[in-house]
A protein has these predicted regions:
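ASCE RecA-like P-loop NTPase motor cores
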Residues: 125-613
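Extended, Lys/Arg-rich, non-catalytic nucleic-acid recognition/anchoring regions
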Residues: 1-7, 333-336
């Protein structure tokens, strides 16, 4: 039987050792190594042997080992044994012993977070993905998982109290199936279901109708935009962009008195029917956020499908350039608006994260076009100044902000595969949420992940044609490939994957680690009341996530990092989730250096020769 501590004859020795002497300074992160280095106790032979197999991989490591034994003669007094250890170390070096696993000899291995051995724990190499020892996920049967999801939603439905009941469940775990069944079971209750997209709205509406549920879906102008006269659609879009949606329907009514536009006539008729409707309603996140308390109080239960923070709050940004803001200050007759702009401009001389008082803008109904969404600007407290000196694509400084989102309802239930308890607590308030993570089941299909390259936008820019090469390698067509929109491949890309079932049960290729601009993470953080150094930039960090220790470009600040990783993971999980691996024996090939749950890491993938597939 082969000794796993010894390299085979075919494995090459190196002139230089794998680790430089500087690593010795970090070895004290290991509790057992501290015992050895500080002479706090006598180590057993097995403990010393384990440490030695790690130290021989380090320049001057052998010398360090012997120096420490000689430094503590009261613990290691036997000169003969010291001579034996010198011989042992020489033999181990000559035979290229591997660093021994912590689990085999360390008495502390169950109480610390460690990787395979001391070296991989304290010094994670770039492009490596070190599995954290002892990390495991508990899986249940599909039936247990589905039952748990239904029970969680049912409990939240019956619960009393003004709270956000947040239920995290895997993609494909039966979230929509569960709440539709609940709608059928409690047919006397009025449910308001909000989903991310019109596409998903139609799908949920159809499923509910097939079960005989009394339900309507909110009409959408976006869904009929191709049939609306271009000049009218352009005017409608501008009203929304200006933050004046309340002008849209009076404008449509006025246009319908001038000429007959069938699609708009039908849209307005559906709106009128909806007003008088007393059954269940399926709508979108955006529509939900526009509903006032009086309208929301008509419903017995509000269920939000998917993470509304990620999909519809943080993604709903506004911005205005400094020059446009100065022009607005000169033109406005509203003293409160003028004062707010003045404070913002003054603070921007020394700050990037700026807080100014919010107020509700009095719209006089003037039909003149506005330069941007003034109502949202007035209601916003936190702004982030994007400086053109720090961003290549900016021609001048710009104030960015998240458009305020209101949740005036009595109780909300959110079901999502990507919701994060800590982030929900920051946004809604820790005392205002009730968070439950459902049981998980193992994938029926397979998620293969290739993590040697970051596959960020800049990585793909430096490796032109990479996505096309990978498509050829795995025999993927554009429809089965998800990557950045800029690549121009297929109908799905990062940012628009939710709610699509076109790839269910199919082998797919996902390429990319979807970073956003740094300002967005900071903007999200200040909007949640998080304090941080606004000058901090992303840098290479060693992090632990999803059972792996690896190097990743992110923030040092823990809260900023949390938001950053949550957004990346949410986007990747949505993309991978299109194949519905939980219920289908298909394969997803993921090229990203961010590890996902249940991923099988494929090492040493050769991008030139196809080795490793």
């Amino acid at each position: 039987t082969r000794n796993s501590s010894v390299k085979t004859p075919g494995e090459k020795s190196k002139n230089h050792k794998d680790f430089r002497a500087g690593v010795l300074q970090d070895m004290n992160k290991c509790k057992l190594f501290q015992d050895f280095a500080n002479g706090s106790r006598k180590l057993s032979h097995d403990e010393l042997f384990g440490i030695a197999t790690n130290l021989i991989q380090v320049e001057t490591g052998t010398k360090y080992f012997m120096e420490k034994r000689l430094e503590y003669p009261n613990i290691y007094p036997d000169d003969a044994k010291n001579e034996k250890w010198e011989a042992h170390l020489s033999y181990m070096e000559q035979n290229n012993y591997y660093p021994q696993s912590c689990d085999k000899y360390c008495p502390y291995h169950e109480e610390c977070t460690h990787c395979k051995n001391i070296l991989s724990t304290i010094h994670t190499k770039r492009r490596s993905m070190e599995k954290i020892a002892g990390y495991h996920e508990t899986f249940y049967s599909m039936e247990e998982m589905q039952e748990d999801v239904y029970d969680a939603i049912s409990r939240a439905f019956r619960a009393r109290g003004k709270k956000f009941y947040i239920i995290k469940a895997m993609t494909g775990a039966g979230k929509s199936h569960s709440y539709i069944n609940l709608m059928q079971e409690y047919s006397d209750s009025r449910f308001l279901i909000a989903v991310p997209t019109n596409l998903l709205k139609g799908e949920i509406f159809k499923k509910a109708k097939e079960l005989g549920i009394e339900v309507m879906k909110t009409p959408s102008l976006e869904a009929i935009k191709d049939r609306i006269p271009p000049d009218i659609w352009k005017r409608i879009q501008r009203m929304y962009q200006e933050g004046r949606p309340y002008l849209v329907h009076p404008y449509i009514q006025k246009e319908l008195t001038k000429k007959e536009i069938p699609c708009l006539r039908k849209y307005m008729e559906k709106r009128e029917r909806l007003k008088a409707w007393d059954g269940c309603v399926i709508t979108t996140h955006r529509y939900l956020l526009s509903m006032d308390q009086e309208r929301l109080d008509e419903f017995d239960s509000i269920i939000i499908d998917e993470d509304i923070l990620f999909k519809s709050v943080i993604s709903n940004q506004g911005e205005i350039s400094v020059s446009d803001l100065k022009k607005l200050k000169k033109k406005t007759t509203d003293p409160r608006l003028s004062k707010k702009i003045k404070k913002l401009l003054k603070a921007s001389e020394t700050q990037s994260c700026i807080k100014v008082e919010a107020f509700e803008w009095d719209d006089d109904g003037d039909k003149k076009s506005m330069p941007f969404d003034i109502p949202s600007f007035c209601l916003t407290e936190w702004f982030y100044l994007r400086r053109c000196e720090n961003e290549e694509n900016l021609v001048e400084d710009v104030f960015a902000f998240l458009k305020p989102a209101d949740f005036p309802g009595e109780k909300y239930i959110m079901v999502s595969a990507t919701a994060d308890e800590e982030i929900c607590g920051w946004y809604f308030g820790e005392d205002n949420i009730d968070f439950y993570e459902c049981k998980k089941a193992e994938y029926m299909g397979e998620l293969k992940q290739y993590c040697e390259k970051s596959m960020s936008r800049s990585c793909l820019n430096n490796n032109k044609g990479m996505v096309g090469k990978l498509m050829n390698r795995f025999g993927m067509c554009p429809n089965n490939t998800i990557t950045f929109m800029k690549e121009g491949i297929g109908p799905l890309h990062f940012g628009n994957t939710e709610g699509s079932n076109m790839l269910e049960g199919k082998d797919i290729l996902v390429v990319g680690t979807p970073y956003h601009a740094e300002f967005l993470y900071k903007l999200a953080a200040i909007s949640m009341g998080i304090e941080f150094d606004e000058e901090e930039k992303m840098s290479l960090q060693t992090i632990d996530h999803n059972g792996y220790r690896f190097q990743f470009t992110t923030f040092q600040n823990k809260e900023l990092r949390k938001i950053h990783l949550w957004m990346i993971e949410s986007e990747l999980e949505q993309a991978v989730g299109r194949a519905r691996l939980l219920r289908n024996a298909c394969t997803v090939h993921l090229f990203s250096n961010f590890p996902l749950h249940q991923a099988k890491m494929i090492p040493n993938f050769n991008f030139e020769e196809g080795h490793g597939m």
